[in-house]
Curated annotation (Swiss-Prot):
It is found in: Cytoplasm. It catalyses: D-glucose + ADP = D-glucose 6-phosphate + AMP + H(+); D-glucosamine + ADP = D-glucosamine 6-phosphate + AMP + H(+). GO terms for cellular component: cytoplasm. The lineage of its organism: Archaea, Methanobacteriati, Methanobacteriota, Thermococci, Thermococcales. Mg(2+) binds at E266, E295, D440. The keyword tRNA processing does not apply. Pathway: Carbohydrate degradation; glycolysis. Its EC number is 2.7.1.-, 2.7.1.147. Keywords: Carbohydrate metabolism, Cytoplasm, Glucose metabolism, Glycolysis, Kinase, Magnesium, Metal-binding, Transferase. Belongs to the ADP-dependent glucokinase family. It comes from Pyrococcus furiosus (strain ATCC 43587 / DSM 3638 / JCM 8422 / Vc1). The keyword Kinase applies. The gene is glkA. Homodimer. This is ADP-dependent glucose/glucosamine kinase.
Length: 455
Protein backbone atom coordinates (compact mmCIF):
# COMPACT_ATOMS: atom_id res chain seq x y z
CA UNK A 1 0.00 0.00 0.00
CA UNK A 2 1.50 3.39 -0.95
CA UNK A 3 2.37 5.78 1.89
CA UNK A 4 0.84 9.26 2.07
CA UNK A 5 4.23 10.71 1.10
CA UNK A 6 4.21 8.61 -2.09
CA UNK A 7 0.62 9.59 -2.87
CA UNK A 8 1.57 13.26 -2.37
CA UNK A 9 4.54 13.03 -4.73
CA UNK A 10 2.45 11.31 -7.38
CA UNK A 11 -0.32 13.95 -7.10
CA UNK A 12 1.95 16.97 -7.61
CA UNK A 13 3.61 15.42 -10.67
CA UNK A 14 0.16 14.74 -12.14
CA UNK A 15 -0.98 18.30 -11.39
CA UNK A 16 2.10 19.92 -12.96
CA UNK A 17 1.27 18.10 -16.22
CA UNK A 18 -2.51 18.52 -16.23
CA UNK A 19 -3.47 21.84 -14.56
CA UNK A 20 -2.13 24.00 -17.45
CA UNK A 21 -4.54 22.15 -19.80
CA UNK A 22 -7.51 23.99 -18.24
CA UNK A 23 -8.51 26.61 -20.79
CA UNK A 24 -10.67 29.13 -18.96
CA UNK A 25 -12.09 29.79 -15.49
CA UNK A 26 -14.64 32.41 -14.54
CA UNK A 27 -14.15 33.94 -11.06
CA UNK A 28 -16.83 36.01 -9.32
CA UNK A 29 -17.65 38.14 -7.47
CA UNK A 30 -15.52 39.57 -4.66
CA UNK A 31 -12.20 41.29 -5.25
CA UNK A 32 -10.73 43.85 -2.87
CA UNK A 33 -7.56 45.19 -1.23
CA UNK A 34 -6.42 43.45 1.96
CA UNK A 35 -4.68 45.67 4.52
CA UNK A 36 -2.89 43.19 6.78
CA UNK A 37 -2.04 44.07 10.37
CA UNK A 38 0.06 41.66 12.46
CA UNK A 39 -1.34 42.11 15.96
CA UNK A 40 0.83 43.11 18.92
CA UNK A 41 -0.57 41.90 22.28
CA UNK A 42 0.52 44.93 24.36
CA UNK A 43 -0.97 47.34 21.82
CA UNK A 44 -4.20 45.30 21.65
CA UNK A 45 -4.53 45.14 25.46
CA UNK A 46 -4.11 48.92 25.71
CA UNK A 47 -6.77 49.47 23.05
CA UNK A 48 -9.17 47.06 24.79
CA UNK A 49 -8.74 48.85 28.15
CA UNK A 50 -9.30 52.24 26.48
CA UNK A 51 -12.47 51.00 24.72
CA UNK A 52 -13.84 49.36 27.91
CA UNK A 53 -12.66 45.84 28.72
CA UNK A 54 -16.03 44.56 29.98
CA UNK A 55 -17.84 45.63 26.80
CA UNK A 56 -15.10 44.14 24.58
CA UNK A 57 -15.18 40.79 26.44
CA UNK A 58 -18.97 40.68 25.89
CA UNK A 59 -18.49 40.78 22.09
CA UNK A 60 -15.71 38.18 22.32
CA UNK A 61 -18.31 35.77 23.78
CA UNK A 62 -20.80 36.29 20.95
CA UNK A 63 -20.10 38.09 17.68
CA UNK A 64 -22.24 41.09 16.71
CA UNK A 65 -24.01 41.01 13.29
CA UNK A 66 -21.92 43.93 12.08
CA UNK A 67 -19.49 46.44 13.53
CA UNK A 68 -20.64 49.88 14.62
CA UNK A 69 -18.36 50.59 17.61
CA UNK A 70 -14.66 50.22 18.45
CA UNK A 71 -15.55 47.80 21.29
CA UNK A 72 -17.41 45.60 18.77
CA UNK A 73 -14.33 45.63 16.51
CA UNK A 74 -11.93 44.72 19.33
CA UNK A 75 -14.38 42.15 20.77
CA UNK A 76 -14.69 40.46 17.37
CA UNK A 77 -10.89 40.31 17.02
CA UNK A 78 -10.75 38.77 20.51
CA UNK A 79 -13.50 36.27 19.54
CA UNK A 80 -11.20 34.95 16.77
CA UNK A 81 -8.13 34.89 19.03
CA UNK A 82 -9.90 32.97 21.84
CA UNK A 83 -11.04 30.24 19.44
CA UNK A 84 -8.26 30.32 16.84
CA UNK A 85 -11.10 30.65 14.29
CA UNK A 86 -11.45 33.07 11.38
CA UNK A 87 -14.43 35.42 11.11
CA UNK A 88 -15.38 38.37 8.91
CA UNK A 89 -17.82 41.19 9.64
CA UNK A 90 -18.95 44.33 7.83
CA UNK A 91 -17.80 47.61 9.38
CA UNK A 92 -20.75 49.94 8.92
CA UNK A 93 -19.59 52.92 10.99
CA UNK A 94 -17.38 55.59 9.38
CA UNK A 95 -15.68 56.50 12.72
CA UNK A 96 -14.68 52.82 13.17
CA UNK A 97 -13.37 52.73 9.58
CA UNK A 98 -11.30 55.83 10.39
CA UNK A 99 -10.07 54.17 13.61
CA UNK A 100 -8.90 51.15 11.56
CA UNK A 101 -7.20 53.36 9.01
CA UNK A 102 -5.30 55.19 11.78
CA UNK A 103 -4.39 51.89 13.47
CA UNK A 104 -2.67 51.14 10.17
CA UNK A 105 -1.35 48.02 8.44
CA UNK A 106 1.89 46.18 7.75
CA UNK A 107 1.23 45.34 4.11
CA UNK A 108 -1.31 45.62 1.32
CA UNK A 109 -2.23 42.52 -0.68
CA UNK A 110 -4.76 41.22 -3.16
CA UNK A 111 -7.96 40.37 -1.32
CA UNK A 112 -11.38 38.86 -1.90
CA UNK A 113 -11.83 35.24 -2.90
CA UNK A 114 -12.14 35.96 -6.64
CA UNK A 115 -9.09 38.26 -6.62
CA UNK A 116 -6.91 35.83 -4.66
CA UNK A 117 -7.94 32.92 -6.92
CA UNK A 118 -7.27 35.03 -10.05
CA UNK A 119 -3.68 35.62 -8.97
CA UNK A 120 -3.19 31.95 -8.08
CA UNK A 121 -4.83 30.35 -11.14
CA UNK A 122 -3.85 32.98 -13.71
CA UNK A 123 -0.65 34.41 -12.26
CA UNK A 124 0.89 31.20 -10.86
CA UNK A 125 -0.73 28.21 -12.60
CA UNK A 126 -0.98 29.97 -15.99
CA UNK A 127 -4.68 29.06 -16.38
CA UNK A 128 -6.63 31.81 -18.24
CA UNK A 129 -9.13 33.46 -15.87
CA UNK A 130 -11.84 36.09 -16.23
CA UNK A 131 -12.36 37.87 -12.92
CA UNK A 132 -15.10 40.14 -11.61
CA UNK A 133 -13.69 43.26 -9.91
CA UNK A 134 -16.42 45.47 -8.37
CA UNK A 135 -14.20 48.57 -8.31
CA UNK A 136 -11.01 48.71 -10.34
CA UNK A 137 -8.80 51.38 -8.77
CA UNK A 138 -5.18 51.82 -9.84
CA UNK A 139 -4.08 50.33 -6.51
CA UNK A 140 -6.38 47.33 -7.02
CA UNK A 141 -5.19 46.82 -10.62
CA UNK A 142 -1.55 46.86 -9.55
CA UNK A 143 -2.15 44.03 -7.08
CA UNK A 144 -2.91 41.65 -9.97
CA UNK A 145 -0.01 39.49 -11.12
CA UNK A 146 1.05 39.36 -14.76
CA UNK A 147 -0.31 36.41 -16.71
CA UNK A 148 -3.57 35.39 -18.42
CA UNK A 149 -5.83 37.36 -16.02
CA UNK A 150 -8.66 39.28 -17.69
CA UNK A 151 -11.47 41.66 -16.82
CA UNK A 152 -14.30 42.23 -19.31
CA UNK A 153 -14.97 45.78 -20.49
CA UNK A 154 -17.66 47.04 -22.84
CA UNK A 155 -16.48 49.04 -25.85
CA UNK A 156 -19.22 50.19 -28.23
CA UNK A 157 -21.43 47.39 -26.92
CA UNK A 158 -18.73 44.76 -27.57
CA UNK A 159 -17.12 42.74 -24.78
CA UNK A 160 -13.35 43.09 -24.73
CA UNK A 161 -11.08 41.19 -22.34
CA UNK A 162 -8.10 43.11 -20.96
CA UNK A 163 -5.58 42.65 -18.16
CA UNK A 164 -6.66 44.76 -15.13
CA UNK A 165 -3.48 46.87 -15.44
CA UNK A 166 -4.66 47.98 -18.91
CA UNK A 167 -7.92 49.38 -17.49
CA UNK A 168 -7.93 53.14 -18.07
CA UNK A 169 -10.25 54.22 -15.24
CA UNK A 170 -9.52 54.73 -11.56
CA UNK A 171 -12.45 53.60 -9.42
CA UNK A 172 -12.79 53.39 -5.64
CA UNK A 173 -10.53 51.46 -3.24
CA UNK A 174 -12.35 48.62 -1.43
CA UNK A 175 -10.29 47.87 1.69
CA UNK A 176 -10.63 44.93 4.09
CA UNK A 177 -8.61 45.12 7.30
CA UNK A 178 -7.12 41.78 8.33
CA UNK A 179 -5.91 41.29 11.89
CA UNK A 180 -3.53 38.31 12.01
CA UNK A 181 -2.28 36.51 15.10
CA UNK A 182 0.07 33.53 15.59
CA UNK A 183 -0.58 30.38 17.63
CA UNK A 184 0.03 31.09 21.34
CA UNK A 185 -0.77 34.82 20.92
CA UNK A 186 -1.76 36.12 24.39
CA UNK A 187 -4.22 38.88 25.28
CA UNK A 188 -4.86 39.19 29.04
CA UNK A 189 -5.71 35.63 30.17
CA UNK A 190 -6.64 34.43 26.65
CA UNK A 191 -4.35 32.45 24.36
CA UNK A 192 -4.86 31.61 20.68
CA UNK A 193 -4.99 27.79 20.21
CA UNK A 194 -3.82 28.28 16.61
CA UNK A 195 -2.91 31.01 14.14
CA UNK A 196 -5.75 32.75 12.33
CA UNK A 197 -7.27 36.16 11.60
CA UNK A 198 -10.25 38.44 11.95
CA UNK A 199 -11.44 40.50 8.96
CA UNK A 200 -13.24 43.85 9.16
CA UNK A 201 -14.67 44.83 5.75
CA UNK A 202 -14.74 48.58 5.18
CA UNK A 203 -16.16 48.34 1.70
CA UNK A 204 -19.59 49.23 0.29
CA UNK A 205 -19.31 47.26 -2.98
CA UNK A 206 -18.30 43.69 -2.11
CA UNK A 207 -20.46 43.84 1.01
CA UNK A 208 -23.61 44.49 -1.05
CA UNK A 209 -22.46 42.13 -3.83
CA UNK A 210 -22.31 44.90 -6.40
CA UNK A 211 -22.17 43.21 -9.84
CA UNK A 212 -20.76 45.11 -12.81
CA UNK A 213 -22.73 45.86 -15.94
CA UNK A 214 -20.62 43.48 -18.06
CA UNK A 215 -21.71 40.57 -15.84
CA UNK A 216 -25.35 41.69 -15.86
CA UNK A 217 -25.84 42.65 -19.51
CA UNK A 218 -23.28 40.58 -21.48
CA UNK A 219 -22.69 37.51 -19.35
CA UNK A 220 -23.15 34.98 -22.20
CA UNK A 221 -20.48 36.80 -24.18
CA UNK A 222 -18.11 37.05 -21.19
CA UNK A 223 -18.14 33.26 -20.57
CA UNK A 224 -17.94 32.00 -24.15
CA UNK A 225 -14.48 30.40 -23.64
CA UNK A 226 -14.93 29.27 -20.05
CA UNK A 227 -14.71 25.61 -18.92
CA UNK A 228 -15.25 26.10 -15.17
CA UNK A 229 -16.57 28.75 -12.79
CA UNK A 230 -15.95 29.53 -9.13
CA UNK A 231 -18.31 31.94 -7.38
CA UNK A 232 -18.00 33.48 -3.95
CA UNK A 233 -18.80 36.69 -2.11
CA UNK A 234 -22.41 36.00 -1.07
CA UNK A 235 -21.40 35.95 2.60
CA UNK A 236 -21.60 39.69 3.30
CA UNK A 237 -25.22 40.09 2.20
CA UNK A 238 -28.01 40.75 4.70
CA UNK A 239 -31.76 40.10 4.76
CA UNK A 240 -32.22 43.76 3.78
CA UNK A 241 -30.12 43.73 0.60
CA UNK A 242 -29.81 40.17 -0.75
CA UNK A 243 -32.76 40.04 -3.19
CA UNK A 244 -31.44 41.98 -6.18
CA UNK A 245 -27.90 40.49 -6.24
CA UNK A 246 -29.37 36.98 -5.80
CA UNK A 247 -31.49 37.48 -8.95
CA UNK A 248 -28.35 38.37 -10.94
CA UNK A 249 -26.43 35.41 -9.47
CA UNK A 250 -29.31 33.06 -10.37
CA UNK A 251 -29.45 34.37 -13.94
CA UNK A 252 -25.65 33.89 -14.24
CA UNK A 253 -26.04 30.33 -12.89
CA UNK A 254 -28.79 29.56 -15.41
CA UNK A 255 -26.48 30.53 -18.29
CA UNK A 256 -23.59 28.49 -16.83
CA UNK A 257 -25.88 25.47 -16.28
CA UNK A 258 -27.26 25.71 -19.83
CA UNK A 259 -23.70 25.47 -21.14
CA UNK A 260 -22.95 22.61 -18.72
CA UNK A 261 -20.10 24.54 -17.10
CA UNK A 262 -19.43 23.10 -13.60
CA UNK A 263 -19.73 25.86 -10.98
CA UNK A 264 -18.14 25.74 -7.53
CA UNK A 265 -19.45 27.87 -4.66
CA UNK A 266 -16.79 28.89 -2.19
CA UNK A 267 -18.81 29.27 0.98
CA UNK A 268 -17.65 31.66 3.69
CA UNK A 269 -18.77 32.62 7.16
CA UNK A 270 -22.25 34.12 6.54
CA UNK A 271 -23.61 35.88 9.65
CA UNK A 272 -27.11 36.53 8.27
CA UNK A 273 -29.44 33.54 8.73
CA UNK A 274 -31.83 34.56 5.94
CA UNK A 275 -28.92 34.78 3.48
CA UNK A 276 -27.70 31.33 4.57
CA UNK A 277 -31.19 30.00 3.89
CA UNK A 278 -31.20 31.57 0.42
CA UNK A 279 -27.75 30.16 -0.37
CA UNK A 280 -29.09 26.74 0.61
CA UNK A 281 -32.03 27.25 -1.77
CA UNK A 282 -29.76 27.94 -4.77
CA UNK A 283 -27.09 25.36 -3.89
CA UNK A 284 -28.69 22.83 -6.25
CA UNK A 285 -27.66 25.07 -9.17
CA UNK A 286 -24.00 24.54 -8.21
CA UNK A 287 -21.95 21.46 -9.09
CA UNK A 288 -19.70 21.83 -6.04
CA UNK A 289 -19.34 23.64 -2.71
CA UNK A 290 -16.33 24.21 -0.44
CA UNK A 291 -16.53 24.91 3.30
CA UNK A 292 -14.97 24.47 6.75
CA UNK A 293 -16.46 23.29 10.07
CA UNK A 294 -17.78 26.72 11.15
CA UNK A 295 -19.53 27.16 7.80
CA UNK A 296 -20.87 23.58 7.73
CA UNK A 297 -22.20 23.97 11.30
CA UNK A 298 -23.94 27.23 10.32
CA UNK A 299 -25.73 25.37 7.48
CA UNK A 300 -26.72 22.49 9.77
CA UNK A 301 -28.38 25.06 12.05
CA UNK A 302 -30.50 26.26 9.12
CA UNK A 303 -31.48 22.62 8.43
CA UNK A 304 -32.59 22.32 12.06
CA UNK A 305 -29.70 19.95 12.88
CA UNK A 306 -28.68 21.78 16.07
CA UNK A 307 -27.09 18.73 17.74
CA UNK A 308 -24.97 17.96 14.66
CA UNK A 309 -23.97 21.64 14.38
CA UNK A 310 -22.68 21.55 17.99
CA UNK A 311 -20.87 18.26 17.35
CA UNK A 312 -18.99 19.81 14.40
CA UNK A 313 -17.50 22.47 16.69
CA UNK A 314 -16.94 20.30 19.77
CA UNK A 315 -13.70 18.45 18.94
CA UNK A 316 -10.17 19.15 17.77
CA UNK A 317 -9.51 17.63 15.29
CA UNK A 318 -13.08 17.96 14.01
CA UNK A 319 -14.95 14.62 14.22
CA UNK A 320 -14.91 13.19 10.65
CA UNK A 321 -18.04 11.08 11.25
CA UNK A 322 -20.02 14.19 12.20
CA UNK A 323 -18.61 15.94 9.10
CA UNK A 324 -19.59 13.05 6.83
CA UNK A 325 -23.11 12.95 8.29
CA UNK A 326 -23.46 16.69 7.75
CA UNK A 327 -22.14 16.45 4.17
CA UNK A 328 -24.60 13.63 3.40
CA UNK A 329 -27.51 15.71 4.72
CA UNK A 330 -26.38 18.68 2.61
CA UNK A 331 -25.90 16.58 -0.55
CA UNK A 332 -29.31 14.92 -0.21
CA UNK A 333 -31.09 18.17 0.59
CA UNK A 334 -29.60 20.19 -2.31
CA UNK A 335 -28.44 17.70 -4.96
CA UNK A 336 -24.97 19.30 -5.08
CA UNK A 337 -22.62 16.71 -6.67
CA UNK A 338 -19.41 17.52 -4.80
CA UNK A 339 -18.77 18.80 -1.27
CA UNK A 340 -15.21 19.67 -0.32
CA UNK A 341 -14.66 20.05 3.42
CA UNK A 342 -11.41 21.57 4.64
CA UNK A 343 -10.29 21.91 8.24
CA UNK A 344 -6.99 22.26 10.04
CA UNK A 345 -5.27 18.91 9.60
CA UNK A 346 -7.38 17.07 7.03
CA UNK A 347 -9.75 17.39 4.06
CA UNK A 348 -12.76 15.33 2.98
CA UNK A 349 -14.66 15.27 -0.30
CA UNK A 350 -18.08 13.70 -0.75
CA UNK A 351 -18.89 13.11 -4.43
CA UNK A 352 -21.71 11.57 -6.45
CA UNK A 353 -19.03 10.12 -8.74
CA UNK A 354 -16.06 7.89 -7.99
CA UNK A 355 -12.34 7.90 -8.75
CA UNK A 356 -8.87 8.41 -7.27
CA UNK A 357 -8.63 11.77 -9.08
CA UNK A 358 -10.83 13.27 -6.32
CA UNK A 359 -8.31 12.27 -3.63
CA UNK A 360 -5.34 13.29 -5.79
CA UNK A 361 -6.83 16.75 -6.31
CA UNK A 362 -7.14 17.14 -2.53
CA UNK A 363 -3.48 16.14 -2.16
CA UNK A 364 -2.47 18.73 -4.76
CA UNK A 365 -4.54 21.37 -2.93
CA UNK A 366 -2.92 20.51 0.42
CA UNK A 367 0.55 20.89 -1.10
CA UNK A 368 -0.40 24.24 -2.65
CA UNK A 369 -1.68 25.41 0.76
CA UNK A 370 1.49 24.22 2.52
CA UNK A 371 3.68 25.95 -0.07
CA UNK A 372 1.72 29.18 0.39
CA UNK A 373 1.91 28.95 4.20
CA UNK A 374 5.64 28.23 4.01
CA UNK A 375 6.54 31.01 1.58
CA UNK A 376 3.74 33.56 1.89
CA UNK A 377 3.44 33.43 -1.90
CA UNK A 378 3.89 30.78 -4.59
CA UNK A 379 5.40 31.86 -7.89
CA UNK A 380 5.01 28.70 -10.01
CA UNK A 381 3.30 25.31 -10.13
CA UNK A 382 6.70 23.61 -9.92
CA UNK A 383 7.49 25.47 -6.70
CA UNK A 384 4.67 23.57 -4.97
CA UNK A 385 6.92 20.47 -5.16
CA UNK A 386 9.01 22.00 -2.35
CA UNK A 387 6.10 21.49 0.07
CA UNK A 388 6.53 17.70 -0.21
CA UNK A 389 9.25 18.18 2.46
CA UNK A 390 6.64 19.45 4.98
CA UNK A 391 5.58 16.64 7.35
CA UNK A 392 2.14 15.04 7.08
CA UNK A 393 -0.14 15.88 10.02
CA UNK A 394 0.29 13.07 12.58
CA UNK A 395 -2.95 13.92 14.41
CA UNK A 396 -4.87 12.92 11.28
CA UNK A 397 -4.03 9.24 11.91
CA UNK A 398 -6.88 9.03 14.46
CA UNK A 399 -9.20 10.67 11.91
CA UNK A 400 -8.19 8.12 9.27
CA UNK A 401 -8.74 5.24 11.71
CA UNK A 402 -12.24 6.47 12.55
CA UNK A 403 -13.08 6.70 8.84
CA UNK A 404 -11.62 3.25 8.18
CA UNK A 405 -13.70 1.72 10.99
CA UNK A 406 -16.89 3.50 9.90
CA UNK A 407 -16.68 3.52 6.07
CA UNK A 408 -13.90 1.08 5.23
CA UNK A 409 -11.68 3.82 3.82
CA UNK A 410 -8.58 2.48 2.06
CA UNK A 411 -5.81 4.68 0.62
CA UNK A 412 -8.07 7.63 1.41
CA UNK A 413 -11.12 6.36 -0.50
CA UNK A 414 -14.33 4.78 0.76
CA UNK A 415 -18.05 4.63 0.11
CA UNK A 416 -21.05 5.86 2.09
CA UNK A 417 -24.70 5.55 1.04
CA UNK A 418 -23.83 5.44 -2.67
CA UNK A 419 -21.45 8.43 -2.50
CA UNK A 420 -17.66 8.29 -2.58
CA UNK A 421 -15.84 9.76 0.39
CA UNK A 422 -12.21 10.83 -0.10
CA UNK A 423 -9.91 11.70 2.80
CA UNK A 424 -6.40 13.12 3.05
CA UNK A 425 -4.22 14.20 5.98
CA UNK A 426 -2.77 17.65 5.25
CA UNK A 427 0.74 18.95 5.71
CA UNK A 428 1.15 21.32 8.64
CA UNK A 429 3.59 24.23 8.40
CA UNK A 430 4.75 24.94 11.97
CA UNK A 431 5.22 28.69 11.51
CA UNK A 432 3.18 29.92 8.55
CA UNK A 433 4.13 33.28 7.01
CA UNK A 434 0.42 34.14 6.65
CA UNK A 435 -2.98 32.44 6.75
CA UNK A 436 -4.75 34.81 4.35
CA UNK A 437 -5.99 33.19 1.17
CA UNK A 438 -5.09 29.66 2.23
CA UNK A 439 -8.73 28.50 2.14
CA UNK A 440 -9.11 29.97 -1.36
CA UNK A 441 -5.88 28.28 -2.45
CA UNK A 442 -7.17 24.93 -1.15
CA UNK A 443 -10.62 25.11 -2.75
CA UNK A 444 -9.61 26.48 -6.15
CA UNK A 445 -6.62 24.12 -6.49
CA UNK A 446 -8.77 21.08 -5.60
CA UNK A 447 -11.61 22.04 -7.97
CA UNK A 448 -9.36 22.95 -10.92
CA UNK A 449 -7.01 20.03 -10.20
CA UNK A 450 -9.83 17.50 -10.13
CA UNK A 451 -11.25 18.78 -13.43
CA UNK A 452 -7.79 18.81 -15.07
CA UNK A 453 -7.21 15.15 -14.08
CA UNK A 454 -10.18 14.19 -16.28
CA UNK A 455 -8.88 15.99 -19.40
Amino acid sequence: MPTWEELYKNAIEKAIKSVPKVKGVLLGYNTNIDAIKYLDSKDLEERIIKAGKEEVIKYSEELPDKINTVSQLLGSILWSIRRGKAAELFVESCPVRFYMKRWGWNELRMGGQAGIMANLLGGVYGVPVIVHVPQLSRLQANLFLDGPIYVPTLENGEVKLIHPKEFSGDEENCIHYIYEFPRGFRVFEFEAPRENRFIGSADDYNTTLFIREEFRESFSEVIKNVQLAILSGLQALTKENYKEPFEIVKSNLEVLNEREIPVHLEFAFTPDEKVREEILNVLGMFYSVGLNEVELASIMEILGEKKLAKELLAHDPVDPIAVTEAMLKLAKKTGVKRIHFHTYGYYLALTEYKGEHVRDALLFAALAAAAKAMKGNITSLEEIREATSVPVNEKATQVEEKLRAEYGIKEGIGEVEGYQIAFIPTKIVAKPKSTVGIGDTISSSAFIGEFSFTL
